Amino acid sequence: MNNKKTATNRKGMIPNRLNKFSIRKYSVGTASILVGTTLIFGLSGHEAKAAEHTNGELNQSKNETTAPSENKTTEKVDSRQLKDNTQTATADQPKVTMSDSATVKETSSNMQSPQNATASQSTTQTSNVTTNDKSSTTYSNETDKSNLTQAKNVSTTPKTTTIKQRALNRMAVNTVAAPQQGTNVNDKVHFTNIDIAIDKGHVNKTTGNTEFWATSSDVLKLKANYTIDDSVKEGDTFTFKYGQYFRPGSVRLPSQTQNLYNAQGNIIAKGIYDSKTNTTTYTFTNYVDQYTNVSGSFEQVAFAKRENATTDKTAYKMEVTLGNDTYSKDVIVDYGNQKGQQLISSTNYINNEDLSRNMTVYVNQPKKTYTKETFVTNLTGYKFNPDAKNFKIYEVTDQNQFVDSFTPDTSKLKDVTGQFDVIYSNDNKTATVDLLNGQSSSDKQYIIQQVAYPDNSSTDNGKIDYTLETQNGKSSWSNSYSNVNGSSTANGDQKKYNLGDYVWEDTNKDGKQDANEKGIKGVYVILKDSNGKELDRTTTDENGKYQFTGLSNGTYSVEFSTPAGYTPTTANAGTDDAVDSDGLTTTGVIKDADNMTLDSGFYKTPKYSLGDYVWYDSNKDGKQDSTEKGIKGVKVTLQNEKGEVIGTTETDENGKYRFDNLDSGKYKVIFEKPAGLTQTGTNTTEDDKDADGGEVDVTITDHDDFTLDNGYYEEETSDSDSDSDSDSDSDSDSDSDSDSDSDSDSDSDSDSDSDSDSDSDSDSDSDSDSDSESDSDSDSDSDSDSDSDSDSDSDSDSDSDSDSDSDSDSDSDSDSDSDSDSDNDSDSDSDSDSDSDSDSDSDSDSDSDSDSDSDSDSDSDSDSDSDSDSDSDSDSDSDSDSDSDSDSDSDSDAGKHTPTKPMSTVKDQHKTAKALPETGSENNNSNNGTLFGGLFAALGSLLLFGRRKKQNK
């Protein structure tokens, strides 16, 4: 059986058949997962390394003291400067880089407008670094890392999950009890490949040595690899000891809290830095109880101790002891002090708590005489706090007090702050001091120290600018800052745990596992990490059990697929997590023990049916009546909520249809209108008796639905056929036989005048009026047959024998009038009113037959010795008038179709038997017969009267 679900089958049911479901099963090999854990083994997760950049513009033509010019160092020389100031800034000034979480770059610029003399010095100083993992996570010094691990370990499970803890081989008590004070395990933490490196670094072109330029973006980085013995337990300690010239941090002082983190932000060891002893003591957390074979590497930002390493271009022994492993390296330090500059500044340190900049400014190191000397400080992103009274002005009494590290021993300086007025302006962002203080001239030298506090309302990166305005012009110096990160890694073989439990059939749908309820085999279960990444998948066994193995402590997500034919039961029913259902998706937390409480329950999904009836609504009222029948063969389509066709069927001989094996949900039923039928009215009465229309939306909720009906009626058609057939036949036959034999010796004068008038008038009138008005179906057949037969027979027999010797004068006047009048009037009126289809056929057949037979036989025998003069004049007038009038009026008023077929036909039923040869139009047939009949009758009469006249004589 193929259990693979395609994208198509996944969307809906198979049309018009029972949907059968089988539980799918994947055979998945369970693989043990060895999780490599990344550790951040660094110092002071709360500290940011600061790199200081200083740029100065001087009023000297040349500066004999070498100054760093490779990195952000420029010097402009004023042509009006005295020739003794011929020092040129070189590229031998230092730049220091330290791998703390932030490097603050300070740039100092000293400008003198008239002279255009510029010297640029870049100084990078670093504070303590926050150790980062391989994912480059940065922890700033100001962040309290002590709460980070707690936040990471908070379970995201939406309900309380009971976890069965497994006792460990060691430290089992420590997993539930407060950590006990451990012992120093410096001998169990082993460091190799220790190095103190200068990040970036600058090469002295004269000596070829790489130097650490503390104020030019260089940083120092302490690097090492390490391993931790498995015997180390929570609460044990180890130390980092820094030497006389080396400390953690950067320009920013190291914070007291120095924690070590792993890649996920979990605390491995908590460190406390003691600035007096320059030592950090670390205490292991229970991380070491959860992992074995822990090893790693780290990179930590560090900085020269400015109060001890005070002189530029001097190699200091940077020494550190990690655990019991000691390492030292000579590092040449240069802070970039330019003794010929009349104005130069540097950041002494950045306070770790409030991030204030503690600045040191050297004024008039060359000891020149000024007649004008105004010192101005402009802050960007910072503010002064006049109430703090930390703007100090010291008078230098010994040239050696200008130490290169900008960290003078102020106890040996003369504090003259009270002699000057510091004028604050620009919302305490500008401070101005007149260093002449009313004197006409002065060559005094000053060291000015001030504190600049971050301006929280500012969005600028921050900058501190200094200006010294003298009679020779302006000199300026600028300090700016940027961040630099350190990093570290660590890994170990983590202790492994299991997660899983059970998928069961909840037959009573109460959301709880009962003793008689069984597991469901073949349910897919997917395991994901807290970020939603799939880690593994498996399938429940024949008992409904599943398990994921080889898992580390952490938060996981478990997803259950709904087996075919089932519905998820109620989740989190009751208070016992061990026997309830956790739903389709749940969260499980592993914390030093297996978690076998993640269950899910399902019950078999009941199947439902829908359908009913399609009927012929003969009275078009939209309601099913007892006399109305179903319509067979109507196509019905079923769609799911997505509009996908999931079934088609046709109504049976009773108009019934049905769809089965349906889940609860939304569907659409579509009826296809049969040809020749019209949709009846919808929703006219009760739902189980009315019509629902061509498309019906229906929702099945735990029940069948057999109320989905539809009705149709026949389309309106009227057919009216009116046929009128009128046949008029007039047959007039006149036969005249005259035989005259005259023998006369004398004189006979015979005058015969025959006037025969035959008038045949046949009038056939057929009037058919068919009026049909129908709404439905009416078949009306009207047939009118009218047959009129007129037979007129006139027989005249005349025999005349005349024998005369004398004059015979015969005057015969024969008047034969044959009048045949046939009047046939057929009136057919058919009125049909039907509801649907009206077919009116009116057939009117009128047959008029007129037969006129006139027979005249005249025999005249005349014998005369005399003169016989016979004059026969025959005038025969035969008038036959046949009038056939057929009037068919068909009026049909119907809703659909009304064909009207009028037809009028005159039929000659006797034409074959009796008709004379045609000598004219068909209407003159009877007239010709009458004419000849009259002529023969007249001739006969003439002979008859001739004979009589002869006899009379």
Curated annotation (Swiss-Prot):
InterPro entries in UniProt: Adhesin_Fg-bd_dom_2 (IPR011266), Adhesion_dom_sf (IPR008966), Fibrogen-bd_dom1 (IPR011252), Ig-like_fold (IPR013783), LPXTG_anchor (IPR019931), SDr-like (IPR050972), Sdr_B (IPR033764), SDR_Ig (IPR041171)
Cleavable signal peptide: 1-50
UniProt keyword terms in alphabetical order: Calcium, Cell wall, Peptidoglycan-anchor, Repeat, Secreted, Signal
Proregion span(s): 920-953
An individual GO BP term: cell adhesion
Record-linked SUPFAM superfamilies: Bacterial adhesins (SSF49401), Hypothetical protein PA1324 (SSF117074)
Compartments, as annotated in UniProt: Secreted, Cell wall
Biased composition (Acidic residues): 685-695, 712-892
Gene3D superfamilies in alphabetical order: 2.60.40.1280, 2.60.40.1290, Immunoglobulins
Region (Ligand binding A region): 51-495
Polar residues bias spans: 56-71, 84-114, 133-160
GO CC annotations, alphabetized: extracellular region
Subunit structure and binding partners: Homodimerizes; via N2-Domain. Interacts with host NRXN1; this interaction mediates bacterial attachment to host cells.
Protein name: Serine-aspartate repeat-containing protein C
Source lineage: Bacteria, Bacillati, Bacillota, Bacilli, Bacillales
Encoding gene, per UniProt annotation: sdrC
